[in-house]
Amino acid sequence: MEFIEKVQNDNKAVSEIIKGWGSDIIVTRGKCYRAEDLDGILVYDNGKIIGLGLYRIKRDCEIVLLETFVQNKGIGTQIIEKIKEIAKSKNCKRIWLITTNANINALGFYQKRGFHISNIYKNAMEKSRKIKPEIPRMENGIEIRDEIEFEMEM
């Protein structure tokens, strides 16, 4: 496995992954992001992307997307550690992210890695669906309704 910082040449491959989810935009807290506008960490194995973390730094570090295609190998944890190193080097005071109430794997994953719930935005997904109608309504048999903000102080 190789962890590398995303460069311009990676944008097409990353955009194709995101388009596979129905659209080439990522919506969080009512804001739209495009992969090519975000910094990131890519994980390659035998020339294939098996994980990625996209983030933006604006005083604090926001993890906009974290995805691994091979589970239970520590890839997501290692991506977070790489992003934490970058955030520290940029003097960020915290790392934060948004997930949904129905993403039960993420809810446990982030708490096990030291993140704390800092906000719950009730019914926020309705606003996000106005921007990106492709967002599903259900996940894990749970209505996708609320956005949950996690943070970690640096």
Role assignments for model-derived ranges:
Residues 1-9, 148, 153-154:
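Conserved N-terminal entry element of GNAT/NAT acetyltransferase domains
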Residues 5-71, 77-80:
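Acetyl-CoA-dependent GNAT
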Residues 83-87, 106:
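Short hydrophobic clusters on alpha-helical segments that form packing/core surfaces
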